[in-house]
Swiss-Prot record:
The keyword Flavoprotein applies. Its EC number is 1.4.99.-. Oxidative deamination of D-amino acids. FAD binds at residues 3-17. This is D-amino acid dehydrogenase. It comes from Salmonella paratyphi C (strain RKS4594). Transmembrane segments: none annotated.
Length: 432
């Protein structure tokens, strides 16, 4: 089958890889000059299934009001003047109760755990290297309340069979030795030993090269004007003076998917702006061994080979990509506070990107009402974490194979009022 994939970020490229491996003739179209040039370029570097959780959580509405008056707030909202933004925020608020949070986090963890397993299989099969580490993730708590609140997330981890360790502050240095110098600032941490890290852009570029060698065609510097449709199917992609035709079409345009699908499929994917710093390492012993997540500021600090990646923040501001100095100062503040000897901050590269977020935090993967149009978008801050699993899942569904995990509650159909998902089965249980 001829398949056109729109988008060459990590989600688009993994989709191309798995569809190609399934025997399809795949073409990837992107306006950029190469893969992973936008949202996948400089994310936090975490592959953290256990921390897969929606921003829509109990208490967030009140916290958002408080954050409005804080200098280093993890979330900021600025109206962009569109009704869509207001509708999206209202849908997000409706998911900020315990029932929705547990349901959304459960399916996010399900897909993310599967994705991590798919990445392991891919790595073993291809030998792909991307400055990856398999050292786990450590979520750091600065208050006693945060430590106590971890029990809510632990319940989801146990239900999904995700191994974990709840550590007191005195034990954090066993996992991240450099934290011994700042343990007095912390109350404890939640460690997920099976989590991984890696350079998402490097992975995407190298996998794209492998995919091309396997027969995938990449059409870079090719802006897409619109999808052409009639009745219940898509019949082409209009690019300037050319119409590119295929048997099936996959939308993986990230935050730009919503506009491209206007009038065709209504999906609630909105850009969530994030920032990162990439810092050269000065003292390896003063840098993280793997990756940490600061629960207070929602900022991740990740070790690559010779660099530290500091990523976080969430701005609901539309498609604005201005680099704002106050957010750089927040990233600098957190990394100085936790790893003061780790990197040369003055030489850091400052970056921003737009993560495609749904109101419930779960991506949109699967079929649409158009028989040859498929979606793989809306992964929010977890595109790197969920990319391989989403790509394999999409390939299985499109190819008529039975996927390894339940998937009906990942489709756009879940936003219908009459939607009733099949309850996923518990896979296993293990923790320490």
């Amino acid at each position: 089958m001829r398949v056109v994939i729109l988008g060459s970020g990590v989600v688009g490229v993994t989709s191309a890889w798995y569809l190609s491996q399934a025997g399809h003739d795949v073409t990837v179209i992107d306006r950029e000059s190469g893969p992973a040039q936008e949202t996948s370029a400089a994310n936090a570097g975490q592959i953290s299934p256990g921390y897969a959780a929606p921003w829509a959580a109990p208490g967030v509405p009140l916290k958002a009001i408080k954050w409005m008056f804080q200098r280093h707030a993890p979330l900021a909202v600025r109206l962009d003047g569109t009704p869509f933004q207001l509708k999206w925020m209202w849908q997000m608020l409706r998911n900020c109760d315990t029932r929705h949070y547990m349901e959304n986090k459960g399916r996010m963890v399900r897909l993310a755990e599967y994705s991590r397993d798919c990445l392991k299989t891919l790595r073993a099969a291809t030998g792909i290297e991307y400055e990856g580490r398999q050292g786990g993730t450590l979520q750091l708590f600065r208050t006693a309340q945060q430590y106590e609140n971890a029990t809510r997330d632990i319940a989801v981890l146990e239900d999904a069979g995700v191994p974990y360790q709840l550590l007191e502050a005195s034990r954090l240095a066993e996992v991240e030795p450099a934290l011994a110098e700042v343990a007095h600032k912390l109350t404890g941490g939640l460690r997920l030993p099976n989590d991984e890290t890696g350079d998402c852009q490097l992975f995407t570029q190298r996998l794209a090269r492998m995919a091309e060698q396997a027969g995938v065609t990449f059409r870079f510097n090719t802006p897409v004007e619109k999808l052409l449709y009639e009745n219940d199917q898509i019949y082409g992609v209009k690019c300037a003076d050319e119409i590119i035709k295929a048997d099936a079409y996959v939308m993986a345009f990230g935050s730009y998917s919503t506009a491209m699908l206007k009038g065709i499929v209504d999906i609630p994917v909105y850009p969530l702006k994030g920032y990162s710093l990439t810092i050269p390492i000065v003292e390896p012993d003063g840098a993280p061994v793997s990756t940490i997540l600061d629960e207070t500021y929602k900022i991740a600090i990740t070790r690559f080979d010779k660099r530290i990646r500091v990523g976080g923040m969430a701005e609901i501001v539309g498609f604005n990509t201005d680099l704002l100095q106050p957010h750089r100062e927040t990233l600098e503040m957190v990394v100085r506070d936790l790893f003061p000897r780790g990197g040369h901050i003055e030489q850091a590269t400052f970056w921003t990107g737009l993560r495609p977020m749904t109101p419930d935090g779960t991506p949109v993967v699967g079929r649409t009402r158009y028989k040859n149009l498929w979606l793989n978008t809306g992964h929010g801050t977890l595109g790197w974490t969920m990319a391989c699993g989403s790509g394999q899942l999409l390939s299985d569904i499109l190819s008529g194979r039975t996927p390894a995990i339940p998937y009906d509650d990942l489709s756009v159909a879940r936003y219908r009022s009459d939607f009733t998902p099949t309850r996923p089965q518990r896979l296993h249980s293990a923790h320490n």
